[in-house]
UniProtKB/Swiss-Prot annotation:
The keyword Coiled coil belongs to this UniProt entry's keyword annotation: yes
Annotated GO CC locations: cell cortex; cellular bud neck; cellular bud neck contractile ring; cytoplasm; MIH complex; mitotic actomyosin contractile ring; plasma membrane
SUPFAM superfamilies in alphabetical order: Calponin-homology domain, CH-domain, GTPase activation domain, GAP
Quaternary structure and interacting proteins, as annotated: Interacts with AFR1. Interacts with AKR1. Interacts with activated CDC42. Interacts with calmodulin CMD1. Interacts with myosin MYO1 and its light chain MLC1. Interacts with BUD4. Interacts with INN1. Interacts with SEC3. Interacts with TEM1.
Matches recorded under InterPro entries: CH_dom, CH_dom_sf, IQ_motif_EF-hand-BS, RasGAP_C, RasGAP_dom, Rho_GTPase_activation_prot
Residue ranges annotated for the Ras-GAP domain, each copy included: 876-1100
Any single biological process term in GO: protein localization to cell division site
Gene designation per UniProt: IQG1
Originating organism: Saccharomyces cerevisiae (strain ATCC 204508 / S288c) (Baker's yeast)
Name recorded for this polypeptide: Ras GTPase-activating-like protein IQG1
Record text about domains: The calponin homology (CH) domain binds to actin filaments and is required for their recruitment to the bud neck.
C-alpha cells in the first residue's frame, strides 16, 4: 500500500494520461438528457388526463427555476464554509503522527474537503468527517441525491427520504448519483459500486469518486460550483478519531489524481448567465482548452558498462554505508509526448469504456461484426433506462433517435481491421505510458532502499574485483586462545550494554512500579466491576427464573397427577357408582328381609286389597265417562246398523256389473282372433306369389344402375378424381404434420400418420444395460472410497493417539492430507443423511405426507446456510424438490381444474419463499407496475353504480341506468383502459424481458406443462398450468408482498384493492378465459391477445439442457470437494430424529436404512451454535428399480408403436390397449413382421411366446398395470396421453433418448475413472499410513527393554520345588508389574468384577474403616511390548476365594484401536468376569512399560 504524500490536488501529483483524458472528453461522451419516450403502453389514453400532468410539470419547473436562482447567488457570492476544526494555515504539528497515522490524517483531510464542497452546494450541514467515514449517514444516499438534484434536477425527480432504518428503496438515491457520475464522465476506474456504499463495503472508494467528480466538474464547468479547498495541515484530528477510522478501514490507499488544478479561479460574476434549472443544464457544453503540442518523449537510455572495464575511482570510499539522499534532490522530469492525431481525438474518446456491456468493440470476426454494426450504444442505454429507471412508465414522449454518422455506413472487412489495429496501437501506447508512470511512482516511494541496494551492489562488486586484482597476503599466525579472548571481549561488551540499560531503568524504577501497580489495580477494578455488574444484571432475572422454574415444576407435578386422574376418570366414576349402588341395595335388602320375615301374610293381604281398590277405581272412572256420552253412543250404533243395511241392499245389484265387464273381455278376444287370422291369410298369399324375390330383383336393378352411372362418370373424370384424392390425402397429411409439431397433446390420428418412421429404430435396452453396469461399478467404487477414507481416518486417529501419549519421537509432517482429498467428517452419518435429503426429494415428499407442518418449517434450511443465498447447485436441487411436490399435488388432485383452483398449495408457498429469499433483485421488474398502480388517477372500479355514487355522492335513481350518465360512462371506460394497460405492462414483462425471469421459474413452468399434459389431454389446461406459476406465484409474490422489498404505498388499502382486481384479470387473460360481468367489454381485447398469450407461455419454457445439467450434478458432487451445509445444532438433531421416527415408512433396500440403522452419535455435537456439515456424495446409490421402470416404460412405448400400425383405432391409446382383437389382426401382425425384419430383432418381440399379436397385447397390458402400481401414471385420468406425447416427441427426435443415455454413460465412465484414480491414491496413502503406524509402534517397542528383572537363586529353587510338587502355575514371561484391586480401581482401570462389591464401606464398632476391596492381585507382563499378558490371582482362602488363578492376553495395537472411531469403552477379560476401562488401561500400559523412566 502506498502512503499519502499530500493532497491529490497538489501540482506535484500530475497524471498526464488522465489529464489529457479530461481535457479531450468529447461532446457525445454521454447522451444528453431528454424526455423519455412514451411507448404504446405509456399512451396518455391509458394512463392519466393531460391536465393533471401539465399542472404537475409546471410546478416542478417553477420550483427548479427558484432553486437555480438560489444556487447561482450562492455560488457567486458565498465561499465554502470551513469546518470548526480548522486551526489556521499550516499550524497543525504533523510530527506527532506516525507514518500510518499520517496516511489516515490525509484521508480525513480529503473527506473534509469533499464535505466542505457538498455543504456549499446543497447549503446544508453534513455530519462530521468521522461520522461520514465510519457511520451510516451516507448509506441512504440522501445527501448524494440532493447534490445530484442541485446540479441538475432532471437527473432525479424524487428523493427517497431517510428513515429510521435503511431500506431497499434508498438505492434509488444512489442510482440517481450514478447518473450524475455518468453524465460528468468519470472514468470507470474511479467509480464506486452500489454495494460499496449501500452495504458499506468500501467507503474510501466513495470519497475518491466524489473527489474525482468535483475535480472534473471544476475543470469542465468552471464557476458553476465552488472550488475545492485544500485543508491539509489546517485541520486537526484527535488520535482517537484516527484510530476509529483505522479500525473501520484497515487498508486505505491514496486517492488517484486527474492532474487538474482544483484551485482554478471561478468565472467572472459579471458574465451573463443563462436561465437553467440547475447548476449544469447541458453536460455536453463545457470549456475545452486547446491541446498544446508537447515535445516528444525521449526515454533515457541506461548506460551499461562492462564489469571488467569499470572505473573504481567513481565508487565512494565508504562502502559499508550508502549516502543519504533527500527527496528534494530528486529531479522529476516532465514527460514529453508526441502530438496526438486529431482523428484520434474525435467525438468518441479512445479510452471511454461504457459500464454497459457493448458489442461495438467486439472480438467477433469481421464477417460477424458487420451484422452488429447497427447495435449502437443508444439502444443499449435505452434498454438499460427501461430496465433500471423506476419512473420510466410515467413519461409520455419519445425523442428522435440519434444515429452515429459512422454507423450508417457499413464497414468493409479491411476498414474494420484497420480501425481495430489503430485502436489497439493507441491502447498499447497508453498502457505502456501508464505502466512507466506507475513504475516511476514506485521508484520514488522506495528511493532510499534502492540507493542503499545500489551502494551495496557497488561495494560488493568492488570487493570482489579487489580480491581478484589486489590479493592480500596474510601470514599464518597461530595465536593461542583467540576464541576465548574474543568471547571475553564480546561478553564484556554485552554486560556493559545490559548494565547500562539497568542503570537507565533504575532511574525510573518508582515510575515503573507505580505504573505496574496502577495497571494491576485498574485490571482488578475492571474485573470486580464486571462481576458486580453481571451479578446486578442477573440477580433479578435469576430470581425470577428460579421462581418460574419452581412454579413450572409444581404445575407439572399437579398436571401429571391431574392427567393420570383424567385418564382413569371413567373407571373411577364407574367404581364409585358401583359402591353407591351396593350400599343402597344392601340397606334396602336389609329392610325388606326384616319386614318380610315378620309380616309376610299381612303384606300379601295388603297387596291384594290395593290391587282391588285400584281396579275398581279404574272401572268407576270409565263408567262415569261413558255415562256422559250416552246420547252419542246411541246415535253411533244407529249409524252402524244403517250402514250394514245399505251394504246388503247394494249387494243385490252386483251381478249386473260383473256381467258388463265379462262382455267387454269377450269382444276383445273375438277381435284379436279375427285380426290374427287375417294376417296369417295375407302372409300365405305373399309367400305363394314370391313377393320378397320380386323386391330383391328391384333393389338389385336400382343399385346396378347407380353403379354403372358412377363408373362411367369416374372413367370420364379419372384424372380429376385422382387429383382430388391426392389433395385430400395431402391436406390430411399436412394437418396431421402441423398437429404433430405444434400441438403439445397431439391426437392418435395425427401420430398414426407418421408412426411408421419409428420402425427399425434402435432400442434403448442395450445402452440402458450398459448404463446400469457403469452405475453399479460406480456404486462399488464409492463404497470402496468410503471404506478407504474410514481406514485412513482410523490410521490418522491412531497416530494422534500415539502422539497424545508421547510415543512419537519425530513427527511425520507428510502425514497431513489436504482437506479437499479427505474431508474431516466429524459427523459422518449426518453428512450422508443431509446429502441424501438434498439430492433425493422423495424423502421430504414421504415425510410431508406424514408431517406437513414439520416439512414446511424445516425443509428450506437443508438446502442453504442461514442468512445466505443458495449457490447454483443448491438452487438446482431445491427446484427439483419443488417439482416433486408439484407433481405430487397434480397427481393427488381429482382433476386439473381443481388443481388450478387451489391457490394455497404447499409448493406455491415454498416457491414464494424461495423467490423472497433468493431473488429479491427481480422486484425491480415489477416496480413500474407498482408505480402505475400507486398513481391516484388510476382506478380499476368496474361497477357503474359505485362509480356513479363516487362521482355524484349519492346512489343512482332506480328508474334509469348509471351508464346513461355521461361522466359515469367516461369514468367507466377510463377505468377499463387503465386495467387493460396494467395487464399489458405485465404481458410486456414476459414478452421483452423473458430472459430476465429466473431460470428456476421457467424450469418449473416447463415441468408443470408436462405434468398437466400427462394429467389431461387438453392443450388449454397445460397452458393454464403455466399461468398459475407466472401469475399466481411470480407476479403475486412481488405485488402482494411489496412492503418486504422496501416499497411504500401512500394508500395501502386502495392499492390492495387494485392489486386484487389486477390479479383476477391477469388470471383471466393468461388462462385464456373470458371476462364476465361488468368487465365483459374487455373480451374483445382479450380475444385479440389470446394468440400472443399462447406464444408468451410457450416462450417461457426452457430447453432440456437445463434438466440434463441438473442430472449431472450428482456425478459432479462425487469428484468435487465436499459441499458444505451450516445448520443450527438443534435443527440437525430435530430433522434427523424425525427421519429416524419414520424410518419404517421407507423401502427396506433404501440407503437411509444403512445410514440410520444405528442411533446417530451426537456426543461430539456442540450443545448450542451452528454445525458445519461436509456433505458426503459417496452415500448416493443408483436405484436399480428406477432403471427397471425406465425399461418397462420404453417397452410399452414400442408396443404402442407396433399396435397403432395393426389396429384401426383413432380415439386414444387407452381404447387401443383394451380393444377387442379382430380376426384380421393376427394376419396383419404377421405381415407387419415380414415387411419389417428389423422389428423381429427387438428383444421384446423375441421374448413373445408364441409370437402372436394377442401375446403382445397381453404382455403390454401387464406392463401398463405394473407401471400404474408404482405410481408412474394413471391411465384412467389421461387415457395414456403421456405415452402418445412421448411417441410424438420421439418421431420429432428419434435418437434423443439413446443420446441422453449415451451421454449419461460417458459422464458415468468419466466419474468412474476419476473415482478409481482417487481410490488408487487413497489406497497408496492408506498403505503408507499403515506402514508408518506399524513402523512407529515397532520402533518405540524396540527402543525399550522388556526383559525381566534377574531372579535370585532362591527364586529358581522355589520354581523347581513347585514343579516337583505339581503346584506350578502359568507364569508370565518378560517384564511384569503387579497391582491389587484397590490400586487398579482407584486408577480407573478396573470397572467391575463379577460377584464382587468394589469399594464397599464396612462399618465397625468404632466407626467406618474405609472402603474394602477383595484381595485379588493382577499381574501384567510383556516380553516384546507388542502383546501383553494379564494374570488374576485370588489371594483369599476358604469360602471367600471365588476365582482360581487365570491368565488372559491382549495386543497393544488392539488396545490403541479401541481409542479411535468407533471407540470401545470397555473390555471383558477372564471369561467376561472382569470389566476394564480401555482408555485407563492404555494409560497404565504406557506409563509403566513405555515411560517407566519418567515415573
Amino acid at each position: 500500500m502506498t502512503a499519502y504524500s499530500g493532497s491529490p490536488s497538489k501540482p506535484g501529483n500530475n497524471n498526464s494520461y488522465l489529464n489529457r483524458y479530461v481535457e479531450n472528453l468529447g461532446t457525445n461522451v454521454t447522451p444528453p438528457l431528454r424526455p423519455q419516450s412514451s411507448s404504446k403502453i405509456n399512451s396518455s389514453l391509458n394512463i392519466a388526463s393531460p391536465s393533471h400532468l401539465k399542472t404537475k410539470t409546471s410546478a416542478s419547473n417553477s420550483s427548479a427555476t427558484i432553486l437555480s436562482k438560489k444556487v447561482e447567488s450562492s455560488v457567486s457570492k458565498l465561499k465554502p464554509s470551513l469546518p470548526n476544526k480548522l486551526v489556521g494555515k499550516y499550524t497543525v504539528d504533523l510530527s506527532n503522527y506516525s507514518k500510518i497515522e499520517l496516511r489516515y490524517y490525509e484521508f480525513l483531510c480529503r473527506v473534509s474537503e469533499v464535505k466542505i464542497w457538498i455543504e456549499a452546494v446543497i447549503e446544508e450541514a453534513l455530519p462530521s468527517e468521522i461520522e461520514l467515514c465510519v457511520g451510516d449517514s451516507l448509506r441512504n444516499g440522501v445527501f448524494l441525491a440532493k447534490l445530484t438534484q442541485r446540479i441538475n434536477p432532471d437527473l432525479t425527480t424524487v428523493i427517497f427520504p431517510a428513515g429510521d432504518k435503511l431500506q431497499f428503496k434508498h438505492t434509488q438515491n444512489i442510482n440517481a448519483f450514478f447518473g450524475l457520475v455518468e453524465h460528468v464522465g468519470v472514468p470507470d476506474s474511479f467509480r464506486f459500486e452500489l454495494q460499496d456504499l449501500y452495504n458499506k463495503k468500501n467507503i474510501p472508494q466513495v470519497f475518491e469518486t466524489l473527489h474525482i467528480l468535483i475535480s472534473m466538474i471544476n475543470k469542465k464547468w468552471p464557476g458553476k460550483t465552488p472550488a475545492l479547498t485544500n485543508v491539509s495541515g489546517q485541520i486537526s484530528f484527535t488520535k482517537e478519531e484516527i484510530a476509529a477510522c483505522k479500525k473501520a478501514w484497515p487498508r486505505i490507499r491514496d486517492f488517484k489524481s486527474l492532474g487538474t488544478n482544483i484551485n482554478t479561479a471561478p468565472a467572472s460574476p459579471e458574465e451573463p448567465k443563462e436561465k437553467r434549472s440547475g447548476l449544469i443544464k447541458d453536460f455536453n457544453k463545457f470549456e475545452r482548452p486547446n491541446i498544446p503540442v508537447e515535445e516528444i518523449l525521449i526515454t533515457p537510455r541506461k548506460n551499461i558498462t562492462d564489469a571488467n572495464c569499470s572505473d573504481f575511482s567513481n565508487t565512494p570510499s565508504p562502502y559499508n554505508e550508502a549516502p543519504k539522499m533527500s527527496n528534494l534532490d530528486v529531479v522529476v522530469e516532465k514527460r514529453k509526448f508526441t502530438p496526438i492525431e486529431p482523428s484520434l481525438l474525435g467525438p468518441t474518446p479512445s479510452l471511454e469504456y461504457s459500464p454497459i456491456k457493448n458489442k461495438s468493440l467486439s472480438y467477433y470476426s469481421p464477417t460477424i461484426s458487420k451484422y452488429l454494426t447497427y447495435d449502437t450504444e443508444f439502444y443499449t442505454r435505452r434498454s438499460r433506462a427501461r430496465e433500471e429507471d423506476l419512473n420510466y412508465y410515467q413519461t409520455f414522449k419519445y425523442s428522435p433517435s440519434h444515429y452515429s454518422p459512422m454507423r450508417r455506413e457499413r464497414m468493409t472487412e479491411e476498414q474494420f481491421l484497420e480501425k481495430v489495429v489503430q485502436l489497439q496501437n493507441i491502447c498499447r501506447g497508453v498502457n505502456t505510458r501508464f505502466n512507466l508512470y506507475i513504475q516511476k511512482r514506485l521508484l520514488n516511494l522506495f528511493e532510499q532502499d534502492i540507493l542503499r541496494f545500489q551502494a551495496c551492489l557497488r561495494g560488493n562488486k568492488f570487493r570482489v574485483l579487489s580480491s581478484m586484482y589486489l590479493p592480500i597476503r596474510r601470514a599464518k599466525i597461530d595465536v593461542p586462545h583467540v576464541e576465548a579472548i574474543q568471547s571475553r571481549i564480546k561478553g564484556s561488551r554485552i554486560r556493559y550494554k545490559y548494565d547500562k540499560l539497568k542503570f537507565t531503568l533504575s532511574r525510573f524504577s518508582c515510575t515503573v512500579e507505580l505504573l505496574q501497580a496502577y495497571c494491576r489495580s485498574k485490571l482488578l477494578k475492571t474485573t470486580v466491576n464486571t462481576k458486580l455488574n453481571d451479578i446486578e444484571i442477573s440477580h433479578y432475572p435469576l430470581t425470577k427464573l428460579q421462581s418460574y422454574m419452581r412454579a413450572s415444576y409444581v404445575r407439572k407435578k399437579v398436571m401429571s397427577l391431574n392427567t393420570k386422574l383424567n385418564d382413569e376418570r371413567e373407571s373411577i366414576m364407574k367404581f364409585s357408582a358401583i359402591i353407591r349402588g351396593n350400599v343402597v341395595r344392601c340397606s334396602e335388602d336389609a329392610i325388606l328381609s326384616a319386614v318380610h320375615d315378620v309380616h309376610k301374610e299381612n303384606i300379601s293381604k295388603l297387596q291384594s286389597l290395593i290391587r282391588g281398590i285400584f281396579t275398581r277405581s279404574c272401572l268407576a272412572s270409565i263408567i262415569y265417562s261413558l255415562g256422559k256420552e250416552n246420547c252419542n253412543i246411541i246415535q253411533l250404533s244407529a249409524c252402524i246398523r244403517g250402514n250394514a243395511v245399505r251394504h246388503k241392499v247394494q249387494s243385490l245389484f252386483a251381478p249386473e256389473n260383473n256381467l258388463s265387464e265379462t262382455v267387454h273381455d269377450l269382444q276383445g278376444l273375438v277381435r284379436g282372433i279375427l285380426v290374427r287370422y287375417t294376417l296369417d291369410l295375407v302372409d300365405d298369399i305373399v309367400e305363394y306369389n314370391n313377393l320378397a324375390l320380386f323386391q330383391a330383383f328391384s333393389r338389385g336393378a336400382l343399385v346396378r344402375e347407380s353403379l354403372d352411372q358412377k363408373s362411367s362418370f369416374y372413367k370420364r373424370n379419372v384424372r380429376s378424381v385422382i387429383m382430388i384424392q391426392s389433395w385430400i390425402r395431402k391436406s390430411l397429411q399436412r394437418s396431421a404434420y402441423l398437429e404433430l409439431l405444434d400441438c403439445p397433446n397431439p391426437s392418435l390420428w395425427a401420430v398414426k400418420k407418421f408412426v411408421h418412421l419409428l420402425n427399425g429404430t434402435a432400442t434403448i435396452e442395450e445402452v440402458q444395460n450398459q448404463l446400469e453396469s457403469c452405475q453399479a461399478s460406480l456404486d462399488s467404487e464409492n463404497m470402496k472410497k468410503e471404506r478407504l477414507l474410514k481406514s485412513i481416518r482410523q490410521q490418522l486417529n491412531i497416530n494422534g493417539v500415539l502422539d497424545k501419549f508421547g510415543l512419537l519421537k519425530d513427527k511425520d509432517h507428510e502425514l497431513g492430507i489436504s482437506d479437499s482429498t479427505i474431508p474431516k467428517s466429524k459427523y459422518q452419518k449426518y453428512e450422508k443423511l443431509f446429502y441424501m435429503l438434498q439430492v433425493d426429494p422423495s424423502y421430504w415428499k414421504l415425510l410431508y405426507l406424514k408431517e406437513p407442518e414439520f416439512v414446511a418449517k424445516n425443509v428450506y434450511m437443508t438446502f442453504g446456510t442461514v442468512n445466505q443465498r443458495m449457490n447454483d447447485r443448491e438452487r438446482s436441487y431445491f427446484t427439483r424438490f419443488v417439482c416433486e411436490m408439484l407433481q405430487n399435488a397434480i397427481n393427488e388432485a381429482p382433476s386439473i381444474e381443481s388443481f388450478l383452483d387451489n391457490r394455497s398449495q404447499f409448493w406455491q408457498t415454498i416457491l414464494q419463499d424461495f423467490l423472497r429469499r433468493e431473488s429479491p433483485e427481480f422486484f425491480s421488474i415489477i416496480v413500474p407496475v407498482l408505480d402505475y398502480l400507486s398513481d391516484p388517477v388510476v382506478d380499476f372500479e368496474s361497477d357503474p353504480y359505485k362509480i356513479y355514487q363516487e362521482i355524484h355522492g349519492f346512489s343512482s335513481p332506480q328508474h334509469c341506468s348509471p351508464v346513461d350518465d355521461a361522466s359515469t360512462k367516461n369514468k367507466f371506460i377510463d377505468n377499463l383502459r387503465c386495467l387493460w394497460h396494467a395487464i399489458e405492462m405485465v404481458a410486456e414483462i414476459y414478452t421483452r424481458k423473458v430472459h430476465t425471469i429466473p431460470v428456476e421459474i421457467r424450469y418449473l413452468c416447463t415441468k408443470i406443462f408436462c405434468y398437466a399434459a400427462d394429467k389431461n389431454i387438453e392443450e388449454i389446461d397445460s397452458l393454464r398450468a403455466i399461468s398459475s406459476i407466472l401469475v399466481n406465484v411470480f407476479v403475486s409474490e412481488y405485488l402482494v408482498n411489496r412492503e418486504y422489498y422496501g416499497y411504500k404505498d401512500s394508500n395501502v388499502q386502495k392499492n390492495n384493492q387494485k392489486i386484487d382486481i389486477l390479479m383476477k384479470s391477469l388470471a383471466t387473460v393468461f388462462e385464456i378465459k373470458n371476462f364476465d360481468g361488468f368487465l365483459d367489454p374487455l373480451n374483445q381485447y382479450a380475444n385479440e391477445i389470446k394468440p400472443h398469450i399462447k406464444d408468451v407461455l410457450y416462450n417461457v419454457l426452457v430447453d432440456p439442457e437445463y434438466e440434463q445439467e441438473g442430472d449431472r450434478l450428482i456425478y459432479l458432487d462425487m469428484v468435487s470437494p465436499s459441499p458444505k451445509l451450516e445448520l443450527l445444532t438443534e435443527k440437525v438433531l430435530e430433522i434427523s430424529g424425525k427421519f429416524e421416527e419414520y424410518l419404517n415408512e421407507f423401502p427396506e433396500a433404501d440407503i437411509l436404512h444403512d445410514i440410520l440403522e444405528k442411533n446417530l452419535d451426537n456426543s461430539s455435537f456442540p450443545r448450542s451454535g451452528r454445525v458445519t456439515l461436509e456433505l458426503d456424495a459417496s452415500a448416493y446409490r443408483f436405484l436399480v428399480s428406477d432403471d427397471k421402470m425406465r425399461k418397462i416404460y420404453d417397452q410399452v412405448k414400442r408396443a404402442f408403436v407396433y399396435m397403432m400400425q395393426i389396429e384401426d383405432v383413432d380415439t386414444n391409446l387407452y381404447d387401443l390397449s383394451i380393444s377387442t382383437i379382430l380376426p384380421q389382426d393376427e394376419p396383419n401382425f404377421a405381415n407387419f413382421l415380414e415387411q419389417n425384419p428389423k422389428i423381429r430383432d427387438d428383444p421384446m418381440i423375441q421374448k413373445l411366446k408364441p409370437l402372436k399379436y394377442f401375446t403382445l397385447k397381453n404382455v403390454t397390458l401387464k406392463k401398463i398395470h405394473e407401471l400404474e402400481s408404482t405410481g408412474t401414471f394413471c391411465s384412467s385420468d389421461n387415457k395414456l396421453q403421456n405415452f402418445l406425447n412421448d411417441i410424438a416427441n420421439t418421431i420429432k427426435n428419434p435418437n434423443y433418448a439413446i443420446d441422453y443415455v449415451t451421454q449419461e454413460i460417458y459422464i458415468t465412465k468419466e466419474t468412474l475413472t476419476k473415482i478409481s484414480e482417487m481410490n488408487h491414491s487413497l489406497d497408496i496413502e492408506l498403505s503408507r499410513l499403515k506402514k508408518h503406524v506399524d513402523h512407529t509402534i515397532k520402533d518405540f517397542q524396540k527402543a525399550k527393554d522388556f526383559s525381566p528383572v534377574h531372579k535370585s537363586k532362591f527364586g529358581n529353587f522355589k520354581n523347581a520345588v513347585k514343579k516337583v510338587q505339581g503346584r506350578e502355575r502359568s507364569e508370565l514371561q518378560g517384564m511384569k508389574f503387579k497391582w491389587n484391586t484397590k490400586q487398579l480401581y482407584e486408577r480407573g482401570v478396573l470397572k467391575t468384577i463379577r460377584g464382587e462389591k468394589l469399594a464397599e464401606l464396612t462399618v465397625k464398632v468404632f466407626g467406618s474403616s474405609g472402603p474394602k476391596f477383595p484381595d485379588i492381585i493382577f499381574k501384567i507382563s510383556t516380553s516384546d511390548g507388542s502383546r501383553f499378558g494379564i494374570q488374576m490371582i485370588d489371594k483369599r482362602k476358604g469360602p471367600d476365594k471365588r476365582y482360581s488363578d487365570d491368565v488372559d492376553s491382549f495386543s497393544f495395537k488392539d488396545l490403541i484401536k479401541t481409542q479411535v472411531e468407533p471407540k470401545i469403552e470397555t473390555w471383558k477379560l477372564f471369561h467376561s468376569n472382569v470389566v476394564v476401562n480401555n482408555s485407563q488401561l492404555l494409560h497404565l500400559i504406557v506409563s509403566f512399560f513405555y515411560k517407566r523412566n519418567a515415573l
